[in-house]
């Protein structure tokens, strides 16, 4: 059945297909229709897991970027995910980069996007999170507005942290998208140190205010040198971050040279990212020595490479591009088998 749906949406522009799918899932998440979707999916229960002090119904999650505004939380939830990461969301709404900005690399099962954090703003997303009936864990992925100077970038993250804290199962600090100018600079040196210090200070204040501890993860890029990775791992440990998501999309085109759309600018996700993200997880795991849990993301399209990420050191997994190419059966297979 999904093959028919995929054939139809693949006739459409990639972003229009994405928006259409979100609307379908929003409708399917409606209390009137959700039982129908659940009966079609027959999602298995999966294996509960506690990571970052949070109880996840199963270790398979939806990666950020799929549901930027939290419009289809209940629809995605019906597919069987143990957790959903909504966003990336910024303090105020922004249009993102010029269209077209999403491109399929069908022969490689990859996607290039240069969206640029298009979203309706944090307040809109929080309302959707508050209204969701989904019983799994909801993570909120936060970023900075495009026109906020890098030097003031931490203010945007603190603003979003304040808004999201009471409604999130966990919060992800996204400093690794290649589509916001200079954003990845926040992964390095004094910027990184200063950002994490500010975030941890604010987390302590909010934990006291709301009488609960909400863990904070950092999402990193796959395009890191060995020394950069070591430095990032050291900084994460030093600031006692609660988790790390490895990885975001890649700007490398080594695995897709010569393919249609490979020349498009932006972040490449899907199967071409599979090996690279697993290698980063493996190296990160060696550096972190179990002190900080890793959430693995990047190119998961089946049980074998999902298991490879677990063996490399990931405790939770996230999918997105694989869902586009393989449909809900991918989620079902992973939930049924990954512990």
From Swiss-Prot:
The active site is at residue 177. It catalyses: (S)-dihydroorotate + a quinone = orotate + a quinol. It is an enzyme of class 1 (oxidoreductase). FMN binds at residues 64-68, 88, 141, 174, 219, 247, 270, 299, 320-321. Substrate binds at residues 68, 113-117, 174, 179, 248-249. The keyword Oxidoreductase applies. Its EC number is 1.3.5.2. Binds 1 FMN per subunit. One of its GO terms (cellular component) is cytoplasm. InterPro entries: Aldolase_TIM, DHO_dehydrogenase, Dihydroorotate_DH_1_2, Dihydroorotate_DH_2, Dihydroorotate_DH_cat, Dihydroorotate_DH_CS. Pfam families: DHO_dh. It is a peripheral membrane protein. GO terms for biological process: 'de novo' pyrimidine nucleobase biosynthetic process; 'de novo' UMP biosynthetic process. Pathway: Pyrimidine metabolism; UMP biosynthesis via de novo pathway; orotate from (S)-dihydroorotate (quinone route): step 1/1. It is found in: Cell membrane. SUPFAM superfamilies: FMN-linked oxidoreductases. It comes from the Bacteria. GO terms for molecular function: dihydroorotate dehydrogenase (quinone) activity. Its cofactor is FMN. Keywords: Cell membrane, Flavoprotein, FMN, Membrane, Oxidoreductase, Pyrimidine biosynthesis. Belongs to the dihydroorotate dehydrogenase family. Type 2 subfamily. HAMAP family: DHO_dh_type2. Catalyzes the conversion of dihydroorotate to orotate with quinone as electron acceptor. Monomer. This is Dihydroorotate dehydrogenase (quinone). It comes from Haemophilus influenzae (strain PittGG). The gene is pyrD.
